[in-house]
Amino acid sequence: NVTIPYKKEIMDQLDFISDESRKIGAVNTISLENGKLYGYNTDYYGFGLMLDISKIEVKDKRAVVLGTGGAAKAVVTYLQDKGVKELFVVSRNKMKNNWSGEVNLIDYSDLQSLEGDLLINTTPVGMYPNVGKSPVGENVIKRFEAIVDLIYNPRETELLRLAKLNGKKSCDGLYMLVGQAVKAQEIWQDMNIDNKVTNIIYEELNGEFN
């Protein structure tokens, strides 16, 4: 596995880069296959698993992504690949647009009047130990159908608490964490891992965090 700050730099050393990694511009998993180095981004697959399990639809939806870091790039790439209708990325510096494809870069003041189907937090706001904070207020949350927070500690962030309070469909990032790790094992072992195994790992970690 590869972590920050080497996810981008390592790409020049690889013989093969997967499609999702090339689009994202980062690799987090490397496999040695027949003497060649292959790079993948399993965050992409982990995010997809999380949405599938939570029954959150992407195709033809209007989505807003909070944050512009590495996780945001994986999320944006997945949304684009799965046919999102309209996509907004919220940044504190909307003049710096490094996004490919149809991405609308806006700032937090623009968000106050925006409505959509899916709101995804990729920022660390609300993560342990700085709990009790939300990247957006209820006035924003009320204008979306589903709220996703990639944070998994705490299990219920302030953002998710407010989402549930307003009757919104919501999910945290624990299944993404598990899903990306399982995908890495599938690559290394060259095998498909049954979803039952993924669920067992999830339940084990769920018990640890609760």
Regions found by a protein language model. Name each.
Residues 72-73, 156:
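N-terminal Rossmann-fold NAD(P) dinucleotide-binding loop
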Residues 150-210:
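Adenosine-phosphate binding glycine-rich loop
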Residues 33, 56-62, 142-143:
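Short helix-loop-beta connector
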Residues 67-69:
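Glycine-rich Rossmann-fold phosphate-binding loop(s) that bind the pyrophosphate
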Residues 81-86, 165-169:
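Conserved S-adenosyl-L-methionine
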Residues 101-170:
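Rossmann-like adenosine-cofactor binding region
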Residues 82-101:
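NAD(P)-binding Rossmann-fold cofactor-contacting core
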Residues 1-54, 156:
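Phosphate/diphosphate ligand-binding glycine-rich loop within oxidoreductases
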